[in-house]
């Protein structure tokens, strides 16, 4: 049975979710809402500076998209309550505008005829967050959920493997994060975050992130044990988590590597990857795993204090997991 999905917001994540859906037989995108006109949406879908050309045909007919021969309804509504998702057969909405991240605002999609909503960013209220490889099994039928953030999707599986095998006393995370759309090409106004307003291509910019604390929401046993920060760096895509951990149970770095490798081949296959190659960030462009453990990059001071490194394509990996969550809540 194919799940019919609508996308609200055709920005970076909306478009990569769309591309990822073309690789699946269980999910079909039937409607897109964005304030862009259809011709421009088609152009943005066809050509991507980071991920290359769209693998398929994209046309516009009567104001709607025709992708690989299938019509996709296009609308330009500001208020989600007016979207009439039911008329397009939409069952689940991928809420990708970044604007409707509370139960109250996202519920407008339900009012408009959808059955369920997946937010493609961390919720700003108590809406539950689900991360594949961490807490999918706790889903209890909620109609509005969040896929958390790309960084939480990298960190949570890594932290879970460490905690399940060795226990985490406390940990600090740094994500070295690629540039995103909220940053400035040259210095510009950013009243809430002065550093964030500095030119993205010229600077390494320290920034805050709620990703580590969010792990405490998806893995309650780690609540209060993790916090973190970010450095925004002048690369277009692919980020890396540096997790410094004090272990409850002593373990050699070799033992940690074995645990990661076993998880990547077992319960976390498709979520957690493992590599012993001499990799750099561009090697992970297009990576669908949300966390790839870099065995060669990590270090240990002793058997209780270690630094672990894990890579993620902050666009592709995350977008694939949005679809995994849509499929999971539709069972």
UniProtKB/Swiss-Prot annotation:
Record carries keyword Oxidoreductase: yes
SMART domains linked to this entry: Gp_dh_N (SM00846)
Source taxonomy: Bacteria, Pseudomonadati, Pseudomonadota, Gammaproteobacteria, Enterobacterales
This protein's name: Glyceraldehyde-3-phosphate dehydrogenase
Active site (record annotation): 150 (nucleophile)
An example molecular function term from Gene Ontology annotations: NAD binding
Gene: gapA
UniProt binding sites for NAD(+): 12-13, 34, 78, 120, 314
Cited function: Catalyzes the oxidative phosphorylation of glyceraldehyde 3-phosphate (G3P) to 1,3-bisphosphoglycerate (BPG) using the cofactor NAD. The first reaction step involves the formation of a hemiacetal intermediate between G3P and a cysteine residue, and this hemiacetal intermediate is then oxidized to a thioester, with concomitant reduction of NAD to NADH. The reduced NADH is then exchanged with the second NAD, and the thioester is attacked by a nucleophilic inorganic phosphate to produce BPG.
Subunit and interaction comment: Homotetramer.
Location in or out of the cell: Cytoplasm
Keywords for the protein's UniProt record, in alphabetical order: Cytoplasm, Glycolysis, NAD, Nucleotide-binding, Oxidoreductase
Site note Activates thiol group during catalysis, residues: 177
């Amino acid at each position: 049975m194919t799940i019919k999905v609508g996308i609200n917001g055709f920005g970076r994540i909306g478009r990569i979710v769309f591309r990822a859906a073309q690789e699946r037989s269980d999910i079909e995108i039937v409607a897109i809402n964005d304030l862009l006109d259809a011709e421009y949406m088609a152009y943005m879908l066809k050509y991507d500076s980071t991920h290359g050309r769209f693998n398929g045909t994209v046309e516009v007919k009567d104001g709607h998209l025709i992708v690989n021969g299938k019509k996709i309804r296009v609308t330009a509504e500001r208020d989600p309550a007016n979207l009439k998702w039911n008329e397009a057969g939409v069952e689940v909405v991928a809420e990708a505008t970044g604007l409707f991240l509370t139960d109250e605002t996202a519920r407008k999609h339900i009012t408009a005829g959808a059955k369920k909503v997946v937010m493609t960013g961390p919720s700003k209220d108590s809406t539950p967050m689900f991360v594949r490889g961490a807490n999918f099994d706790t889903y209890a039928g909620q109609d509005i959920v969040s896929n958390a953030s790309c960084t939480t999707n990298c960190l949570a599986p890594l932290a879970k493997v460490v905690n399940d095998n060795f226990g985490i006393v406390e940990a600090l995370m740094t994500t070295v994060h690629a540039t995103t759309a909220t940053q400035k090409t040259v210095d510009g106004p950013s009243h809430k975050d002065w550093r964030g307003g500095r030119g993205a291509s010229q600077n390494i910019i320290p920034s805050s992130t709620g990703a580590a604390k969010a792990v405490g929401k998806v893995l309650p046993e780690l609540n209060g044990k993790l916090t973190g920060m970010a450095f925004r760096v002048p690369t277009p895509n692919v980020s890396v988590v540096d997790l410094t951990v004090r272990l409850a149970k002593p373990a050699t770095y070799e033992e940690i590597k074995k645990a990661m490798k076993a998880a990547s081949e077992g319960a976390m296959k498709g979520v957690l990857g493992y590599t012993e190659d001499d990799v750099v960030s561009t090697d992970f462009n297009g990576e669908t795993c949300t966390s790839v453990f870099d065995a060669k990059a990590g270090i240990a001071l002793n058997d209780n204090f270690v630094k672990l490194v894990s890579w993620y394509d902050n666009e592709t990996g995350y977008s694939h997991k949005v679809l995994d969550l849509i499929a999971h809540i539709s069972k």
